[in-house]
Amino acid sequence: MNDIKIQKLIWDSTFFGFEIGKIEVNNIEDNKSFKNLIEKSSFQMIQIFSKNDLSKLLGLNPIDIKLTYSKKPSKFNNYNNIKSIDCDLDHTLYSLARQAGKFSRYNRDFKLKMKFELMYKIWMKKSLERDLADEVFVHQNGNTINGMVTVNKSFNYAKIGLIAVDENSQSKGVGSQLIHSVENWALVQNLENIFVCTQKENSVACQFYEKNKFNLSDTIYIYHLWKK
């Protein structure tokens, strides 16, 4: 058990107002010692990340099965409706950010849900300020924003953070245009791959990424273990 450590999640602990830790582990060989480690810790909640399904060992269902999709960027024509943006004048982007997090584990966990909307508002705000994103694209018809995507670069790849399309504009190609704009941006930045994460439960998002030639590259089981 000496190789299993609990890492304090500083931002999460500060934001939610109690101690939150994180464990990354793929196999638990000594379940008794693992439970001992949890019980003796000072954390009120521990997030457990694993490449394997630990449900039986933990006696707990995953709060999220996180899927990571990836693809190499391709060149597309530029779209007149796609704009770069750095402010949210009418709160449309904050609304879309909340929509992007509909299947988020922070929304699904009833003990965290009360701060879910604020969390995604902060995420959108810091993306517009370019603290959590290098670029924010919107799909706009006149003065109406129909969709948005945030993206940042890390090393030789781009990572999509938030993406959402207004309910009235779905199934009209808006999301694909946003993805294509990210691909064009990634090529300009000389980035080799694009990554995006979603939840297995969000089947519509999974189908959307697969339609846009993304391939599943990783699966992570996430558990929220609350101390009694």
Task: Please give the residue ranges for each predicted region.
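Conserved beta-hairpin
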Residues: 133-149, 166
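Conserved acetyl-CoA binding element of GNAT-fold acetyltransferases
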Residues: 15-27, 156-167
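Acyl-donor-binding surface of acyltransferase catalytic domains
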Residues: 24-89, 223-224
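Conserved acetyl-CoA-binding loop-helix of GNAT-fold acetyltransferases
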Residues: 29-37, 162-165, 171-188, 207, ...
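Active-site rim helix/loop that mediates acceptor-substrate recognition in acyltransferases
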Residues: 54, 113-140
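Conserved active-site alpha-helix within GNAT-family acetyltransferase domains
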Residues: 34, 51-64, 172, 176, ...
